[in-house]
Amino acid sequence: AESTQSVNTIYLDNNKVVGHNTDIKGFELGIKDSKFKATGKKILILGAGGVVPSIICALNKMKVSGITISNRTKDRAESLKIFFKNIKIVDWGEIPEFDMIINATSVGLNKDDQIDLNFSKVGKNKFFYDVIYNPKETSFLKIGKKLGNETENGKLMFIYQAFTAFK
């Protein structure tokens, strides 16, 4: 919880309240269950909100080769560098080379949401991951699939996060 500045599970340990973050393990286990092997890969994260520090921690544990963040509000993305010196920040709309792209924005929660990015030059053999699991297939995932890429929603992350919380 300290590394992410985020707590989503609390419990009593010898009459002391302890905070824990289960999103890190949830994301990590969810990715390990997918076909994507993260070690040595370049990652692009869209968004800089509450779940992103947990995703960065998990990706660092998986020994990815690089993490780039793109957020509509660049200052918010820049603030993540205080805790994560290894990340790069790019402007919203800029899509650098990546192996895996993660939608960690709220775009897609509503069925009619459309992500305002041009993915036409992305190509195939990439992994599109959306932390959103309802709807099951967001517009972001539909774009990834249409371009011939593997896609995965955040359902396994959610399941593993909950499972970890109950341990």
Show where each model-derived region lies.
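NAD(P)-binding Rossmann-fold cofactor-contacting core
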Residues: M62-F84
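Active-site capping/gating segments
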Residues: L29, Y133-N134, E150-K167
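Glycine-rich adenosine-cofactor-binding loop
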Residues: N21, I31, G40-N60, V64, ...
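Rossmann-like adenosine-cofactor binding region
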Residues: K85-E152
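Phosphate/diphosphate ligand-binding glycine-rich loop within oxidoreductases
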Residues: A1-S34, I143
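Conserved S-adenosyl-L-methionine
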Residues: K61-G66, K146-E150
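Short helix-loop-beta connector
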Residues: D13, F36-K42, G123-K124
